[in-house]
Structures are given as structure tokens and as C-alpha cells.
């Protein structure tokens, strides 16, 4: 395991930021049902921001074509809540520059991405997210490896019913 980052601390910071932003979004859109929440990153997992989707947003302007495409979702809260995450990821980068990693994917990328996924999973298990809220962690310009991580995350984070809806959507629009 890498000595560059405390993955438990990262997961905790992500959980706190997600819980705060999701709660704020629920308050802001209290007359509307939140249907999706996603964490977006890059292939080096050096950035992290969130997006969300509501029933009203989905039905306005016929956004059904992007229902399961978080990079197209139009809602978010202030990313200031992710400042601690950004600081930790930036510190990782400084240390990372000083070392060469033979197993970069296994030591850096995968566990960082996994910390993001586990944060959402724990919040789902704690009841922060209702069962009908689609959750995802994804790269905004993904390599094949990141697509595999996203797919595994979707399976871990969502019910069979949501995955079936996602697969139907993907067959139609993906």
C-alpha cells in the first residue's frame, strides 16, 4: 500500500463533503426529488467534484437522454466543501512527484478511487441516500481502466433495479 496518502482520512473527508453537499441540495430542492448524485474525477484521481440530478431537472427540456450521464447533470452545491479532499490530493501529488511507482494503478489510482466509492457506499448504508438515488463515481474523460472502475462502482453502489434501468438507458442512449 502507498505511503502517499491516508486512504481512511480521504474517505472520511469525502464522506463529510458528500453528506454536506447532498443535505444542502435536498434543502435547496426540497420541493423536488433528488434522483442522482455522482463524484467526478480525472484519470489520475487528482480532482473531485460532485453533481446531482432531480426529477424536475430530468423532465425539463427532456433531459432523459442524460439521466445516467452524470457529466451532463446540471446541479451541484458549492465545491468549497471538498477543500479538505483537494488539499489531501494535492499533498499526494507533491509526494508522488518525488517517487516512481512501479504499480501506479494498484498503489495510487485504484485505492484513491476506491476511497471515493466507499464514502458513497457507507453513506448509502447509513441511509443518507434513498434506494432510488443513482450513485456513481466516474472519470470525466475515462481511460479503459477508469471505465472498468466506474462499472464496478455502479454495481457496488446501486440496486439491481437501478442497474437494470441504467443498462436499459445505456442500450438506448449510450
Please annotate each region the language model reported.
Residues 25-65:
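N-terminal interaction modules that seed assembly of large macromolecular complexes
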Residues 26-30, 124-129:
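Surface-exposed acidic, glycine-flexible loop patches that form ligand/cofactor-binding
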Residues 1-34:
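Short N-terminal edge-element motif at the start of the domain
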Residues 8, 12, 90, 99, ...:
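Polar/charged alpha-helical tracts
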Residues 125-174:
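Glycine-rich, aromatic-bearing surface loops/beta-hairpins
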Residues 10-21, 106-119:
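Well-ordered, non-membrane alpha-helical segments in soluble/globular domains
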Residues 58-113:
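Polybasic, proline/glycine-rich intrinsically disordered low-complexity segments
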